[in-house]
Amino acid sequence: MHHVNKYFNQTMVIEALKMSFYKLNPKQLIKNPIMFVVEVGMILTLILICFPDIFGTSYLSRSYLITIFIILLITILFANFSEAFAEGRGKAQADSLRQAQSNLTARLIEENGAYRIVNATELKAGQNIRVENGETIPADGVVINGLATVDESAITGESAPVIKESGGDFDGVIGGTLVTSDWLEIRVESEAGTSFLDKMIALVEGAERNKTPNEIALFTLLTTLTIIFLVVIVTLYPIASYLHLILPIAMLIALTVCLIPTTIGGLLSAIGIAGMDRVTQFNVLAKSGRAVEVCGDVDVMILDKTGTITYGNRIASEFLPVNQQMWEKLIVAAYMSSIYDDTPEGKSIVRLAKQMYINELPKDIDGTYKPFTAETRMSGIITNEISVFKGAPNSMINLVKQQQGDIPLNIESICMDVSSKGGTPLIVIENNVMLGVIYLKDVIKDGLVERFAELRKMGIETVMCTGDNALTAATIAKEAGVDRFVAECKPEDKIKVIKDEQAKGHIVAMTGDGTNDAPALAQANIGLAMNSGTISAKEAANLIDLDSNPTKLIEVVKIGKQLLMTRGALTTFSLANDVAKYFAILPALMMSTIPEMTLLNIMHLSSPKSAIISALIFNALIIVALIPIAMKGVKVKGYSIDRIFINNMLIYGLGGLIVPFLGIKLIDMIVQFFV
């Protein structure tokens, strides 16, 4: 999806211009009350052009009325363009995704093993298909046989192919991706219209986006201000009549448009849509605008150690026996406990055992494999002769104690030594006898210390949850720079951590990818699920990361904060604009009748007519000038919340007061020659 990342694309601009005219339809524009008021004013001006004296005698020429009409039309078109352009970027992404699933066929595996070519839309969940090198995977599914590299760039934008194989963490495939080597047999998991790609298209094509609570609140405020200014203008007419000041209806219409918050009113929808779009640029799909907005309020982040803070695939680096006599037995037992373990850790133990053991290791072991679970925290194999297990120190010590076994005196010191280095110790037992420890090495991701420091400045606390013991957790937490950690944390413990933080009034975000993460993802205010994760995790979350990079949560939270700050900054600018325009225009209109108003005419505008035209032109131009900021967002990197607030008040608050005075004066210096 990265190929639609440019902010300005000729095709999108043309489409946005077309949509700008379509959105002139009052049925469309009434969704934005502020711009609807502008359109009503434009229609009234058009009536005045056709019937100049319909509301009473006016000294304004038809050409002047036409000028007002054109400027009002352009103002609405600029506002429509900002929204249409933001929507167009999402639709362009949807089109690129739709290309990935067009005209696909599938090689269906019949019950007798024969193949039959069918249309991808005919596939049913539970059917098996075969996809070979150079073919596109026709549906979402799970690899049941084979190993191949798959190009997922059509979905994720990542050019490097990924390896897919049965079992383990990399057996899920997405329809629309391309097999670039070998072959795969896949069990179909979704049917036409319900695939992950279909859901992605529906998400990024959300033109009918529901407004978020903050947007609704702000829109209510802006609508209220619009009504107040309308009341001010309506009362201004009889006051002007009492003072024998002639204020034509067209001028009152223009004054209304200048004073109501048209700037933020024209950009508000674009800011929200662009916020979702910026999340999509990071290959994260937001199920709603509310999800992105809530990210901006997050002040506690729950982070898994494995895959988020460390690279995830812990590698067996050393076997540490309780004594030298146990050396060979430890290697063989570690190998046997891992031979059917499809996890990256299990495979690394098998590789290390083969490298270090001189004699031949058994290839086929007839026994019952016991996989690792979050409850037991151990895995191994039971045969007729022996039982071999590896697992977390506490679990293994408790198991040996329950079976009246002996605990070697040095086993805890070996585990503590591994933990103090930031590694993960796994104790190996054979027939209830402890043989030693496997040292799994964890590597912390680059640049996290700086990123966590940046989050701290923004008022966000980071909490690392890990199944490791307290010593290992403390070492990694200190090295990575997280604020707090929760050691020996099970999936159900994550929910407790989240609820405890929420009870304190915090807004909590977390990442997850497994079925056991689904309850916590649903409980958290923001849940970011991995694309490589289970369906239940993706359904529970409100954000999905296509790159399956848990660290992405940090970027998403920043974008959420940027969205809120952009909306706040442009609202501040718009309201400051209104105040400035009020004091810029009103004295110019009233000073001929009320000489004291001359003192307030600090801009020395040439005439009431040029003042109105200049203000209208400025009002229209400022909308288009702010579109890039609405699309890209204000800068928030590296600053504390207080610093960002001060910067925004200086730039957008003070700037919103000064810019209209300068802009209107410059335009007036040109307009006075034509009015």
UniProtKB/Swiss-Prot annotation:
Top EC group: translocase
Record flagged with keyword rRNA-binding: no
Catalyses which reaction(s): K(+)(out) + ATP + H2O = K(+)(in) + ADP + phosphate + H(+)
Active-site residue numbers: 304
Predominant location category: membrane
A GO molecular-function descriptor: ATP binding
Transmembrane segments: 34-54, 65-85, 216-236, 245-265, 569-591, 611-631, 644-664
Pfam families with a match to the protein in the record: E1-E2_ATPase (PF00122), Hydrolase (PF00702)
Binding site for Mg(2+): 513, 517
Chain sites annotated for binding ATP: 341, 345, 372-379, 390
Enzyme Commission number(s) from the entry: 7.2.2.6
Protein's UniProt keywords contain Cell wall biogenesis/degradation: no
Assembly and oligomerization: The system is composed of three essential subunits: KdpA, KdpB and KdpC.
Function: Part of the high-affinity ATP-driven potassium transport (or Kdp) system, which catalyzes the hydrolysis of ATP coupled with the electrogenic transport of potassium into the cytoplasm. This subunit is responsible for energy coupling to the transport system and for the release of the potassium ions to the cytoplasm.
Family: Belongs to the cation transport ATPase (P-type) (TC 3.A.3) family. Type IA subfamily.
HAMAP family membership: KdpB
Name of the protein in question: Potassium-transporting ATPase ATP-binding subunit
